[in-house]
Amino acid sequence: MTKYIFVTGGVVSSIGKGIVAASLGRLLKNRGLKVTIQKFDPYINIDPGTMSPYQHGEVYVTDDGAETDLDLGHYERFIDINLNKYSNVTTGKIYSEVLRKERKGEYLGATVQVIPHITDALKEKIKRAASTTDSDVIITEVGGTVGDIESLPFLEALRQMKADVGSENVMYIHTTLLPYLKAAGEMKTKPTQHSVKELRGLGIQPNMLVIRTEEPVEQGIKNKLAQFCDVNSEAVIESRDVEHLYQIPLNLQAQSMDQIVCDHLKLNAPQADMTEWSAMVDKVMNLRKTTKIALVGKYVELPDAYLSVVEALKHSGYANDTAIDLKWVNANDVTVDNAADLLGDADGIIVPGGFGQRGTEGKIQAIRYARENDVPMLGICLGMQLTCVEFARHVLNMEGANSFELEPSTKYPIIDIMRDQIDIEDMGGTLRLGLYPCKLKPGSKAAMAYNNQEVVQRRHRHRYEFNNKFRPEFEAAGFVFSGVSPDNRLVEIVELKEKKFFVAAQYHPELQSRPNRPEELYTAFVTAAIKNSN
């Protein structure tokens, strides 16, 4: 029988529910249990694919092409699993499916209501996420805060699950903030008490509290919370601020969180062996070198827009015993005249993805600086496309060369819309999304990065591709197409072989990086940057 764990949040948003859920998932996985995890997002968008990065942060893409919340990146990196489209559910997605069924007459004339139709659809998503992965345990995080009007149908579905599958198969974990008033010198439990009271008013009694705090929590405070919130005192778990996120699973294990969960759900599983994880954390805490990487992006005011990129750089740094000193460079600020001032102290330059015209000329100048000064450079998605545009303009002398996306009237559309995208008008969910194969050119830097594999599978999110009619001119000038689709139609990786490292990929390699298994192309880039710093 599958066990269901539901993680809710109270008092304030952005309290770290996703990290708690991911950390618990890692602990349960290391007990030998098969774990999956999902995120419920109460917003009305179908998915975050068309949302501004300033609103939502990065869009995380799964193997099967779902555009999802960035928390799924935390889940995959912590638990080291590949999630699917059932792992992110929004209000918009649920209502869209229910209304589509109503239009088809599938409800046989019934009045369609929040209860039972919306709540039934939500419960079906929970069960489908578990069944499609054959999991022993599924962890479901509900976004937002208890008390938000948008969350009510989600919480009602969670309440009903207890009756549907039995109380011994369900556990409710509530994460809250325990504020510390410096002037008074004391922690305040009242916000947590009120949050739990509101949750109980919706029919959910939490079995565990995870309290986010900046200061150590005395046992007396835990006992008080246990008494007023009706949970066992040992089930009041402290989640203190840490230097590195990957410390959190170890901190939670030290408080027997996973054992309490297993006892409640009657899961007979051995103790979690966290030896490898602990060694990784110890290494992360004691890195001996530092390498400066300049990230040239459009959305640098909100680092969450590049969360997976940053994590992938860190992972590759760990593998090289190196801390990454990230220099955020706004692409709008980069010009041919100041590129050296902005980028001259960087050991490597990364140009990540994005959409739209703004900042693209700055990215092109950053790429030009890297090429002309032989600074290791990694381009991702739009960064790959602009790498091709930069080469066309400044090496092949194609004045005005551009991407058709950015300038439809350009004489040299180096990047063009994919053939199967021409007649598509909707923006959401219509990109080339998910896992696709990439055939590597033997002897190339890309092939060497991937240990001379013939084919790698990587995740994509794009609508435009390199225009193949320009391939002969590029190749004649030494531009290497080192990764292509198996049918040779789509360009996946480009590089300049004579440079220290000048490689750009159409796909998003960062989405498959893990703290104990860094993505190979990122590792090759970071390794080249380290050599460049010596």
Curated annotation (Swiss-Prot):
The keyword ATP-binding applies. The active site is at 381 (nucleophile), 508, 510. Allosterically activated by GTP, when glutamine is the substrate; GTP has no effect on the reaction when ammonia is the substrate. The allosteric effector GTP functions by stabilizing the protein conformation that binds the tetrahedral intermediate(s) formed during glutamine hydrolysis. Inhibited by the product CTP, via allosteric rather than competitive inhibition. GO terms for cellular component: cytosol. Mg(2+) binds at residues 71, 141. Residues 292-534 form the Glutamine amidotransferase type-1 domain. Catalyzes the ATP-dependent amination of UTP to CTP with either L-glutamine or ammonia as the source of nitrogen. Regulates intracellular CTP levels through interactions with the four ribonucleotide triphosphates. Belongs to the CTP synthase family. This is CTP synthase. It comes from Streptococcus pyogenes serotype M1. The lineage of its organism: Bacteria, Bacillati, Bacillota, Bacilli, Lactobacillales.
